[in-house]
C-alpha cells in the first residue's frame, strides 16, 4: 500500500518543505506506527510506500483535517 501519511489525531497529512528526497518523511514512513519501507516529499506532503494495509492514509474518511 502507498499513500500520504496521516496524523490520526488531527486528520492532517504530514507536511514537508520540498519535493524530493526527505530524511524526515523517510524516517516517519519507516517508524513502527507506520510500518512503511520508503518515504519522500511529494507536493509538500510525505508520501510513503510499502505500508501495511492496516495503516491509514490521508484523507481519513471520518476525520477531515482541522
From Swiss-Prot:
Q: Which domain of life is it from?
A: Eukaryota
Q: Where in the cell is it found?
A: Secreted
> Sorted alphabetically, which InterPro entries does this protein's record hold?
LCN-type_CS_alpha_beta_dom, Scorpion_toxin-like, Scorpion_toxin-like_sf, Scorpion_toxinL, Scorpion_toxinL/defensin
**Expressed in which tissues:** Expressed by the venom gland.
Which GO biological process entries does UniProt record here? defense response
Any idea where the LCN-type CS-alpha/beta domain is?
A: 1-66
Keywords in alphabetical order, please: Disulfide bond, Ion channel impairing toxin, Neurotoxin, Secreted, Toxin, Voltage-gated sodium channel impairing toxin
Q: Could you confirm whether the keyword Lyase appears in this record?
A: no
Q: Which Pfam families match?
A: Toxin_3
Which GO molecular function annotation, any one, does this entry have? Answer: sodium channel inhibitor activity
Which cysteines pair up through disulfides? They are 12-65, 16-41, 25-46, 29-48
Q: Which residues form a coiled coil?
A: none
Q: State the PROSITE patterns in the record.
A: LCN_CSAB
Q: Which GO terms describe its cellular component?
A: extracellular region
The record's comment about this protein's domains reads:
Has the structural arrangement of an alpha-helix connected to antiparallel beta-sheets by disulfide bonds (CS-alpha/beta).
Give the similarity note: Belongs to the long (4 C-C) scorpion toxin superfamily. Sodium channel inhibitor family. Beta subfamily.
Q: What does this protein do?
A: Beta toxins bind voltage-independently at site-4 of sodium channels (Nav) and shift the voltage of activation toward more negative potentials thereby affecting sodium channel activation and promoting spontaneous and repetitive firing.
- Protein name (database record): Toxin CsEv4
Where does this protein come from, organism-wise? Centruroides sculpturatus
